Amino acid sequence: MLKVNEYFDGNVKSIGFEQKGDKATVGVMEAGHYQFNTAAPERMTVVKGALTIQLADEDEWHTYEQGQSFDVAGHSSFKLEVKTPTAYLCEFLD
């Protein structure tokens, strides 16, 4: 079953799905600044575009481009700066 999610007044949209017990979402973020909280550990992969992120326990910002991934701890948060519309895959690691 697919689950459609919408955040930040429609500027971030994703479709959640499950495959062989693994949960993931694929989505698109419009240009903007966002902050997400995590319940479980996540791996974010940039499909097209770029995401500049700051993890909750870090001072520095890092940019990830097409094909690159970063992990976010569970019960944490991360900030994003998106300069152009960007597609992503979010895999839940629990």
From Swiss-Prot:
It is an enzyme of class 2 (transferase). It catalyses: a purine D-ribonucleoside + phosphate = a purine nucleobase + alpha-D-ribose 1-phosphate; adenosine + phosphate = alpha-D-ribose 1-phosphate + adenine; cytidine + phosphate = cytosine + alpha-D-ribose 1-phosphate; guanosine + phosphate = alpha-D-ribose 1-phosphate + guanine. It comes from the Bacteria. The keyword Ribosomal protein does not apply. GO terms for cellular component: cytosol. GO terms for molecular function: guanosine phosphorylase activity; purine-nucleoside phosphorylase activity; thymidine phosphorylase activity; uridine phosphorylase activity. CDD domains: cupin_PpnP-like (cd20296). Keywords: Glycosyltransferase, Transferase. InterPro entries: Ppnp (IPR009664), RmlC-like_jellyroll (IPR014710), RmlC_Cupin_sf (IPR011051). Its EC number is 2.4.2.1, 2.4.2.2. It holds the Pfam family Ppnp. Catalyzes the phosphorolysis of diverse nucleosides, yielding D-ribose 1-phosphate and the respective free bases. Can use uridine, adenosine, guanosine, cytidine, thymidine, inosine and xanthosine as substrates. Also catalyzes the reverse reactions. Belongs to the nucleoside phosphorylase PpnP family. This is Pyrimidine/purine nucleoside phosphorylase. It comes from Aeromonas hydrophila subsp. hydrophila (strain ATCC 7966 / DSM 30187 / BCRC 13018 / CCUG 14551 / JCM 1027 / KCTC 2358 / NCIMB 9240 / NCTC 8049).
